[in-house]
Amino acid sequence: LHAERLGVDIHVMLADGAPIRNITEAVQNAHLQVEAVVGSPIAAGYACLSPEERDLGVALVEFGAEVTNVSVYASGMLLGLVTIPMGSGDVTDAIASAFGIRRFQAERLKCVHGSAIASPSDHREMIPVNAPGDEMTGPIARHADDKNRIPRAELISVITEQLARLMEEVSRALKSLGFTGQRG
């Protein structure tokens, strides 16, 4: 073979070796073989995107509890990745802070009654801070009525405010990765 130019596109991912060895050993102790160790953004890309999407070009936003990964694929491969140090846990923390409640209560409110889209009916709906069976235990939430219920509209407002901050960061990340595709 003869060539004037040789090129290669590679992605180098750094990881602490100890956790990888621990996971590999745990899998092997279960009498299974580890075929490969793959970075989370690459695994998410293969799990969530079709080969055609990865080929044509797409952005993938992966929301985690502590971080949000923004990755861009084109020509079938990962072109770039930005990790934002914000995630769904920040939404939970904002709810806990806004209403002066415990984190587990905030997580339950987010999962059971939360939404990323406000609705006019939210202003009429009062939601219980405590889980069924736990009524009148723990502190009364800020802005709550005598039955420790809060307006759903206030919960949605806290959630959408946090998500707006996160979306600003996602938008910045996409710009830094050169992604100019249509949104939606």
What is each of the regions a protein language model found here?
Residues 91-103:
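Catalytic P-loop NTP-binding/switch module of NTPases
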Residues 162-171:
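A general structural motif
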Residues 171-183:
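Phosphate/pyrophosphate-binding loops at sites that engage ATP/ADP/AMP, CoA/4′-phosphopantetheine
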Residues 60-67, 73-76, 85-89, 184:
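A short acidic Gly-Thr/Ser loop motif
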Residues 81-83:
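Residue-level detector of high-confidence beta-strand sites
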Residues 27, 62, 95, 170:
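Residue-level signature of catalytic and energy-coupling elements of molecular machines
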Residues 1-59, 78-79, 88, 102-103, ...:
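Nucleotide/phosphate-binding catalytic cleft detector across ATP-hydrolyzing
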